[in-house]
């Protein structure tokens, strides 16, 4: 029988999942397998549904897995980019902070130097001629030891010196938010500086003691 005759006689049938309708006569059916008819079989809908469901579930799981991996990689890449940006911002912040801190320290040293010189000149009644660099280095030592930030600083002076001090150091006191406190126990030619972190005694007795100590230690 030629292929042409077969193609005309037979109709192609592609069952997805088939079973015998009459399983009790399966031996008889198998013996006469040459006489199979389409009616002898049926599609197992239940198994077919289970197979379809299983296939769909696998496809869904695979899709979810791919979506998760894609999302994870995307999130990881975005996180790395944001982390890099954050590091750059922090580096810039710390760099600016260090520069500002150094600038503030220099300005504070300069202001303290001027303050000490003016107060010293007022105490002895004439302009003093000293090595400013030595005094500046000493002030820097105090700042490095005690810290550049004075919290709630107070300038303690004798009441009779209040007007004079306010006139001379008004700009400095206002810009650094210092508070003037009057105390009758402070000598006319002295003062004290107090804050939450440090106390500086600049009375005449304290300055003489400090001067003697510096001479003995040969710091000058």
Swiss-Prot record:
GO cellular-component term (any): bacterial-type flagellum
Any GO MF annotation of the entry: cytoskeletal motor activity
UniProtKB keywords: Bacterial flagellum biogenesis, Bacterial flagellum protein export, Cytoplasm, Protein transport, Transport
InterPro entries: Flag_FliH, Flagellar_FliH/T3SS_HrpE, T3SS_Stator/FliH
Domain of life assignment: Bacteria
Compartment(s): Cytoplasm
Known function: Needed for flagellar regrowth and assembly.
Family, similarity comment: Belongs to the FliH family.
The protein's name in its UniProt record: Flagellar assembly protein FliH
Native species: Buchnera aphidicola subsp. Acyrthosiphon pisum (strain APS)
Gene name tied to this protein: fliH
């Amino acid at each position: 029988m030629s292929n042409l005759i077969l193609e005309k006689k037979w109709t192609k049938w592609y069952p997805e999942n088939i079973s015998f309708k009459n399983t009790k006569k399966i031996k008889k059916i198998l013996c006469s397998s040459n006489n199979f008819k389409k009616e002898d079989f049926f599609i197992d809908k239940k198994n077919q549904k289970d197979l379809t469901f299983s296939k769909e579930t696998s496809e869904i799981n695979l899709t979810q897995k791919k979506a998760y991996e894609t999302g994870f990689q995307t999130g990881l890449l975005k996180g790395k980019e944001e982390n890099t940006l954050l590091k750059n911002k922090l580096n810039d912040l710390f760099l600016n902070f260090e520069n500002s801190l150094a600038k503030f320290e220099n300005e504070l040293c300069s202001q303290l130097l001027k303050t000490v010189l003016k107060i010293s000149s007022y105490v002895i009644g004439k302009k003093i001629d000293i090595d400013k660099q030595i005094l500046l280095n000493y002030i820097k030592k105090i700042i490095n030891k005690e810290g550049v930030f004075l919290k709630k600083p107070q300038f303690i002076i004798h009441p009779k010196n209040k007007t004079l001090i306010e006139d001379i150091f008004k700009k400095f006191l206002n810009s650094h938010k210092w508070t003037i406190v009057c105390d009758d126990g402070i000598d006319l030619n002295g003062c004290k500086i107090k804050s939450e972190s440090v106390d500086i005694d600049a009375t005449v007795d304290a300055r003489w003691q400090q001067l003697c100590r510096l001479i003995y230690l040969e710091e000058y």
